[in-house]
């Protein structure tokens, strides 16, 4: 994120906090539930629902921008399955919105011309080939590496996200070495019982001792590896896994989730709850006057954790976000 954009977002964040205003500054938007993989811990493809048309998406983007949205993360499913993704990305960019897209990498080579306007392409990277493919599907490791190289060659900034399970908890050193080799900022989070996870998610949990030891090592590694995205605050929070604690949550205050059918939610942990709001049935502005808060006992989503700490005006996580612009 460029300095001026950081300054604008920081100002809006501070305004929202000091004056207790609800601003949809950050929006995570599932454009589709369709996916061309079936990861072991995800059941999103089983969530059948309609999708907004490109014209409907444009209308929502117009309103979001007027209300203060400056960062949109397009996700799914696999958003590159939408044939109109280039129109959606380019429309958001013309509004001055910072656009991130989450992908499994399979379609990046085919759709590279359609995503050149992205600010960030985030890819899943779970470890050595045999482990990554075990968690996400045969051939997925090669797809991620190819997608990363093609995106970088086209001057698209790439991030990785790693989901820690019992299969890769002992292989994080491999990931540390690879992200330094590739120079890819990477976030880490535990596999967790979120609302669209597979029913046997517990079988993928790492042992508590193994996970906590891995986080301890990650804290040490971060001192010499600038490509670990997690702030020290979030790593210390994660070191208590699986015991979670409530933290001040930004969801429904400065961040919102839009589901593939246009439903408006505080975050993706509330996807099984109907708040009765939909982009197609009214104005997003009306939602801001309502109390649309997520109620949970804690959070293991790294993006949410980092934004929670930033909203709480914790200096280290804020500086950790800003430094990404200067990471080579």
Where are these regions (language model features)?
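Conserved alpha-helical substructure of the radical SAM core
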Residues: 2-111, 325-328
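A short local structural element in Rossmann-fold oxidoreductases
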Residues: 40-43, 132-133, 269
């Amino acid at each position: 994120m460029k300095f001026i954009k950081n300054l604008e977002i920081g100002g809006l964040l501070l305004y929202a906090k000091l004056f207790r205003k609800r601003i949809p500054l950050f929006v995570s938007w599932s454009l589709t539930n369709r996916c061309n993989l079936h990861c072991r811990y995800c059941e999103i493809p089983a969530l059948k629902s309609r999708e907004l048309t490109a014209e409907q998406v444009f209308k929502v983007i117009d309103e979001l921008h007027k209300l203060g949205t400056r960062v949109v993360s397009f996700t799914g499913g696999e958003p590159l399955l939408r044939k109109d993704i280039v129109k959606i990305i380019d429309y958001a960019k013309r509004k001055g919105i910072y656009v991130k897209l989450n992908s499994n990498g399979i379609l990046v080579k085919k759709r590279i011309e359609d995503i050149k306007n992205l600010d960030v392409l985030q890819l899943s990277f779970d470890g050595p080939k045999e482990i990554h493919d075990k968690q996400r599907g045969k051939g997925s490791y090669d797809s991620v590496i190819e997608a990363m190289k093609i995106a970088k060659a086209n001057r698209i900034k790439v991030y990785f996200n790693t989901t820690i399970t019992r299969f890769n908890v002992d292989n994080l050193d491999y990931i540390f070495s690879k992200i330094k080799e590739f120079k890819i900022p990477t976030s880490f989070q535990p596999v967790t019982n979120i609302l669209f996870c597979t029913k046997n998610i517990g079988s993928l949990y790492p042992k508590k001792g193994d996970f906590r030891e891995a986080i301890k090592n990650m804290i040490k590694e971060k001192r010499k590896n600038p490509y670990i995205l997690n702030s020290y605050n979030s790593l210390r929070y994660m070191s208590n896994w699986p015991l979670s604690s409530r933290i001040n949550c930004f969801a429904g205050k400065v961040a919102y989730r839009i589901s593939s059918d246009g439903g408006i939610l505080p975050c993706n942990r509330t996807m099984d709850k109907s708040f009765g709001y939909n982009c197609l049935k009214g104005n997003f502005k009306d939602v801001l006057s309502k109390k649309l808060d997520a109620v949970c006992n804690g959070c293991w989503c790294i993006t949410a954790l980092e934004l929670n700490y930033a909203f709480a005006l914790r200096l280290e996580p804020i500086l950790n976000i800003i430094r990404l612009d200067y990471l080579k």
